Every structure is written in C-alpha cells, then in structure tokens.
Amino acid sequence: MTIKAVIFDWAGTTIDYGSRAPIVAFQKAFANVGIQISEAEIRQDMGLDKYTHIHKIMDLPAIQNDWQARFQVLPTEDDCNQIFSNFKAILLSSLTEFGQLKPGMSAVIDYLTAHNISYGTTTGYDAEMLALVLPIAAKQGYRPAVNITSEQTGGVGRPAPAMLALAAEQLTVTDPTTVMKIGDSVNDILEGNNADAVSVGIIDGSNIMGLSELAFNALSPAEQAERRAHVTAAYQRAGADYILQSMAELPALLDQINQPVATDH
C-alpha cells in the first residue's frame, strides 16, 4: 500500500492545541442566553459541522431541562439559529488567537512536500471560518491544496465520508485506501473509516485530551500517561488504524507504510 494523499482536520489536529477555540465559543454563546454547558457536553460531538453540533447540544436532556426551566418552553429552530449566529461571531473573533500550528506540523509539511504526497483538509468549520484560518496557516507555511466544508457536500459532514471523498477527488486520488485521514476526534476516525481511508488519531493536543499545552505540561508524568491512555482507548474503540502521540511521529509512519515491498528474484 502507498499513501498518496493525507487529509487533515484543523482545530486540535494541525492548529489550536487542545481544540480550545470552538469550546470557548460554544460556552460563551450558550452563556449569553443563560445556559451553562460543560466541556464534556461539547466535546462528545466535536468533529461535526458547527451548525449540526449546536443542534446536538440543544438535544441533550440536561440542556433541554435547563432551557425549559429558564424559558418555560423547549428550544426551537429559531433558538438554534440565534445561538449559532452568536457562536459564529464569537469564534470568528477568536480564531486568529488560536491559529498557531501544533508541534511537529512544520516537519510534516516539509516531509509531505519532499515525498510528493498531496495534502488537504476536511473541517467542521464553515467557509467563512475557514477563510480566516487559511491565511494564518499560510503565514506559517501550511497551505493545504484543498479544503472541504460541509457546504460543498450538500450539508453532509462527519462522520459521513462525503467531505473526505470530495477532498480525494479534488486531489485526483481515486483509490480511497491510498488516502490517510488524520484527526483528533472520534468523528474524524469514523469519517476515515466510512471512506475506506487509513484513519489516524493524534493524542497530544487533541479534542479528546481537551487540555491546552500549558495545562498538559503542568501534569505529572503519571497524569500525562493516564490522559494519553484515555485518548488511545477512545481511538481504539472508534476503530483507528493508527494512533500517534504527536504529529512528529507521522513521517516515520508514512515511511513504514510506503516502504517498497521486497520481492524475491
């Protein structure tokens, strides 16, 4: 097998260590209408497009109960739209703050370029959010050839394979088994599996880990190992083909997969 294309997620995978920007925006948007939501309630559905994610949060029994207690009615579609609009405004204003490439990404970009492996992205961001992130990434040397949002796939996002399939098509890769999908959430892994791609989960700085770099580095070695084991188990349950501690391990994995098969003469 040879990997011809690598498709990355954005927040928590290539930028924004710990996938903090969406968490902060979700919490602020709900707090603005008097509803408190936990990180765990948000993170369980990370990887979905943000509009769908708002609906998922609204459907949580605890949120429905809090909403009814506060407003005497259940949340409506208009309520979802209002919160999404507020969420988007908050996120757009904060994306530049969280746009730094994660450790190891610069070396990965150099490796992919040197080995003529094309790369692109799929994302839960919409086009407007992506338009803010792309130039920030480009200034750091990260310029994916294609960037797919669910707006380009008729609103069908993860865990369905549509965005990944479109990314591969635009990169002119016809065999999905030669595509590697790298992400930091369960929905990223499911997207890869559903597309028949090679799915890879990143541990450190992931959505599943849920810690900023500062917070993670403040943990004891034993606590770090425990957190990493928790993330590893989540990826294993989702069916990840490979699990990497950090992006720095990706070049070695690609070398391993892409090494020529020895033949007898």
Swiss-Prot record:
Broad EC category: hydrolase
Gene3D superfamilies, per the entry: HAD superfamily/HAD-like, Putative phosphatase, domain 2
Cofactor notes: Binds 1 Mg(2+) ion per subunit.
Keyword field contains Magnesium: yes
Disulphide-bridged cysteine pairs: none
GO annotation, biological process: DNA repair; organic phosphonate catabolic process
NCBIfam families in UniProt: phosphonatase
Family: Belongs to the HAD-like hydrolase superfamily. PhnX family.
Protein name as catalogued: Phosphonoacetaldehyde hydrolase
Upper classification of the organism: Bacteria, Bacillati, Bacillota, Bacilli, Lactobacillales
